[in-house]
Amino acid sequence: MSSVVFDGEEIPLTVIRSDRRRTVGITVKESGEVILRIPPHISEEEAVSFAQSKAEWILRHRTKFEMRERVERHYAEGETIPFFGRELSIRRVEGDKVRAEIIGDELRLTGPLGTGADVFCEAVVFLYRREGLKLLRPIVSEVSKAAGVEPPAVRIRKQQRKWGCCTPKNGIILNVRILLAPKLVIRYLVVHEIAHIEHRHHQDSFWAEVERLMPEFRDAERMLKEYGWTWVF
C-alpha cells in the first residue's frame, strides 16, 4: 500500500484510479482514511509524490477529525434534535407500534419498552424525509423561479458523503441530514443544486450564479464545513 510520511508519522493511502478525473484528488474521510484519486495519464508514483507534498495538510485534517467527539443520539427522553432550524425535545411514549411524529416543539417517539435507538433512528429518518419534503418544496420553487429554470423533482435520501446532487434529468437529490442544519445552510444546498441545472461544473460561472441567487452563500459554506459533521441521526 502506498503512503506518505510527515513528522515521522506514516499515513497510508487508498489509491483509486478514475477515468473521469483530470487531476489528482486527495480526500481525507472522517474515519481518517485518505483517498488518493488518480486520472489515467498520471502514474501512481507521480500521484504519491504529489500527496507527499500535501502531507502536512493531510495530517492536519486527520488530526482534526480525531479530535472531534463523535455525536451519538440515544433518542432518550429529554434529548434534543434539530429540525429545519428549530430544536425539538424528544418525548418517549410507550406503545405497541414504533412511530415518530412532530407535535409542536416535541419529537414524540412511540414504541414498546426496550425499543433500541437504532429502531427509533429509522423512524425519525422516515419522518424527516416525509415532512422535510413539504418544507423544501416552496424553497425549491422560489429558487428555481429566481434561477429561471423549471422547478426540479426533489428527492430526499439518507447518504453518508454527499449533501446533494443534480441528476442527469435535472432532478435534485438532497441528503436527509440537511434537515438537521440551520435554515441558511438548507437554503444554500438547494441553491447549490439548482445552480447545477444550468452549470454542470464548479467553474467561475457556477459560483457567480450561486452568489447571484444567494449573496450570503459563503456564510452557509463556512457553517457546513465547521459543523456539518455534527448533523447526524
What are these regions (language model features)?
Residues M1-R187, I197-F233:
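Active-site-proximal or metal-binding-adjacent scaffold patches in catalytic folds
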Residues V190:
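Walker B beta-strand of ABC/ABC-like P-loop ATPase nucleotide-binding domains
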Residues E193:
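Walker B catalytic acidic pair
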